[in-house]
Amino acid sequence: ILKKLRFFRMDLTSLRYMTQAGGKLPVNLHREFAEYAMSTGRKFIVMYGQTEATARMSYLPAKDAIRKCGSMGIAIPGGKFRIMEDSSTEVKEPDTVGELVYSGPNVTMGYAECAADLEKGDERGGVLFTGDMAKRDAEGYYYITGRKKRFLKMYGKRVNMDEIEQLLRGRYEGVEIACTGEDDRMRIYMEGMDPASCEEVEKFLT
């Protein structure tokens, strides 16, 4: 939408900050906005959050917008992230994917579906299992890789359907791509693709 409005050509002398949140920003758009901000003396800040944590859990400092392109950044002051293999096993190694878990004073106490639920008190204890899969690099910056529910276990290996979609979009530009499936089979839908290229796609993924 901003491109159609010719945002990058607008005379916005009062604009000092640009922020983004609400969904993972594609790396190419992240880089484009970061480079625009740097070239015009503005600050571009990417953020990550969920309603259950009062909207914000992380931010990517403007100075790292290009260097850490694609990252959701680091935890906000007072907060902390962990990468968990399961509910009790923390992943310590960098660049290893697991569920992103946040701890902080801004985590909701829980959900009340009736008046009696209000008496339960704090059910979360300041800890939120986000349902997002992520990894942490060697410098402590976090990257969302997909949703926990969008993983399949095929031939003993965990397959991220979000990563497969991104991989194919990078190779086949202009093609609409969606993945779905069960643990024993993944289905890939590609609109705008020559049916004769199916074998090529299969070889590319294997």
Predicted regions and their residues:
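Beta-strand->loop->alpha-helix junctions that form or flank phosphate-binding loops
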Residues: F44-E52, M72-A75, C179-E182
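Conserved ATP/PPi-binding loop(s) of AMP-dependent carboxylate-activating enzymes
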Residues: I74-G78, T89-G121, V159
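Glycine-rich beta-strand-to-loop/alpha-helix junction loops that act as flexible
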Residues: Q20-G23, Q50, S103-P105, Y155-K157
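Short, P/G- and charge-enriched loop/turn segments at secondary-structure junctions
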Residues: D64-S71, L118-E123
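AMP-binding/adenylate-forming catalytic core of the ANL superfamily
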Residues: G104, M109-G110, G131-T206
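Gly/Ser/Thr-rich phosphate-binding loop
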Residues: L2-K68, K80, S87
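Residue-level signal for well-ordered, solvent-exposed loop/turn and beta-edge residues enriched
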Residues: R82, T89-E90, Y141-Y143
